[in-house]
Amino acid sequence: MSKEFDYIIVGAGSAGNTLATRLTEDASVSVLLLEAGGPDYRFDFRTQMPAALAFPLQGRRYNWAYETDPEPFMDGRRMECGRGKGLGGSSLINGMCYIRGNAMDFDGWAELPGLEDWTYLDCLPYFRKAETRDIGPNDYHGGEGPVSVATPKAGNNPLFHAMVEAGVQAGYPRTEDLNGYQQEGFGPMDRSVTKKGRRSSTARGYLDQAKKRPNLTIVTHALSDRVLFDGKRAVGVTYLVGDSEERVEARARKEVIVSSGAIASPQLLQRSGVGPRALLESLDIPVVHDLPGVGENLQDHLELYLQYACTQPVSLYPSLLWWNQPAIGAEWLFNGTGIGASNQFEAGGFIRTRPEFKWPNIQYHFLPVAINYNGSNGVKEHGFQAHMGSMRSPARGRIQAKSKDPRQHPSILFNYMSTEQDWQEFRDGIRLTREIMAQPALDAFRGREISPGAHVQTDEELDKFIREHAETAFHPSCSCKMGTDDMAVVDGEGRVHGMQGLRVVDASIMPLIITGNLNATTIMIAEKISDKIRGRKPLPRSTAKYYVAGDAPVKGKALREVKQA
């Protein structure tokens, strides 16, 4: 194998696979793609069956299984922080919800100095480029992209429809497309699943078309040790293969692109000598470039579940029983249909809890079964739940390498629930969710409130429940943010400030977290920056219309109003 390439990409995840595929469309360009995990085994139902999404989080084959430091505002809990490991990265283990964020998120990015070409209308063409939606393209959706997007179909679970109707009856808008003209409101939720009912990871969508190209070299089980520099220029990478302690060196003629995700990208930069001077010196790491923002500005989405018993036998509870699972698996394996072919997040919504929020600050995922996201603590009866989470918390955390050892996980602290806004949003969110769940559309299905339980009413009782039960939505981001201020790490093209030949391209470069799931936006970022790297003209700006709430009320009058503490 040649040890010199034009580009070295560290991380074959949502961004890295997109970059590798686009860069190698130019036959004269050579790319080395390094991935610490293994292949995305297509026979492994745990990653390929949409309904099995909880399984990869339960082990370490596909999951880095990071843990936070004790979170000071969450009763000192060490909280789960799963990230994908293997070809596809977190697109190999995520919940497959295809949500792009709100148009106002990107317009907000573009208001920051140096990010003027990140408006929603600049980004929308790249969302479309990446996507093939099963019902065809329009102004908002693509029809020829690598990411297969499935829309909910007639005849799916009646609880999805009842939950959307309940949201509308509670006074919120109805939207036909959470990724279209109007995100705000309740409606069907798209998912990154192929027409044959398989997970549409970036390994399947992007690498499958690129991996046979002679100018792309993929090395799995390759854990990057550090980036190599000649002065301020990145010239290569050293990495470990498997359990070996021997460093392998590869050289980059043009650039090293770090696409290791919001946890591992800042850690790799720090181990390589790019980061806050005081941290590097405390670890005896020679300082290549003092860049204080590396690992700072860390953001995430926190969420919790409101669970209800279901009085009709229409939930997915029977699918949790082992004796029903062989038939579900067989239908999925041979036909690509049935319960196994969906992630079962086919309805959701976005709302504003208070007028001061100019676009939605709460997201809902509806699930027709009562169970934890990671597959634990399944309620042993028919039930359903709403996942409710805040979208743009003011809380900021950080990532810090603990040593030079690439196998040692970093110190992670999100500072969840560290601001008064966090507590207000979650209290409001729980109370508004209860009002939604009390609407007539759910009368035929709604039993008792299982969690938190109807007895949990006061601010103090709600706060206790939040501290004990809120958990990550697995959306870490913003730890190597784009921008020009003193804490920015990269510019609007992903180039690391003060360095040459070094970029970061992944969810870590978001300056502010978006309103929704991160995967589609991470892919969009890589699509957009790949054109920059290739020296191509950007795709023409979209002219699509999009909704701005303006002075519109947060909600209308609920059909059934609910008195709460």
From Swiss-Prot:
GO biological process, one term: glycine betaine biosynthetic process from choline
Catalytic class of the enzyme: oxidoreductase
EC number(s) per entry: 1.1.99.1, 1.2.1.8
Membrane-spanning ranges: none
Active site: 475 (proton acceptor)
Keywords: FAD, Flavoprotein, NAD, Oxidoreductase
Cofactor(s) it depends on: FAD
Region entry Disordered, spans: 182-203
Record-linked Pfam families: GMC_oxred_C (PF05199), GMC_oxred_N (PF00732)
Top-level taxon in the UniProt lineage: Bacteria
Pathway: Amine and polyamine biosynthesis; betaine biosynthesis via choline pathway; betaine aldehyde from choline (cytochrome c reductase route): step 1/1
Family: Belongs to the GMC oxidoreductase family.
NCBIfam families: betA, PRK02106.1
PANTHER family assigned to the protein according to its UniProt record, in alphabetical order: CHOLINE DEHYDROGENASE, MITOCHONDRIAL, GLUCOSE-METHANOL-CHOLINE GMC OXIDOREDUCTASE
HAMAP family (UniProt xref): Choline_dehydrogen (MF_00750)
Protein name: Oxygen-dependent choline dehydrogenase
Organism, scientific name: Pseudomonas entomophila (strain L48)
Species classification: Bacteria, Pseudomonadati, Pseudomonadota, Gammaproteobacteria, Pseudomonadales
Gene: betA
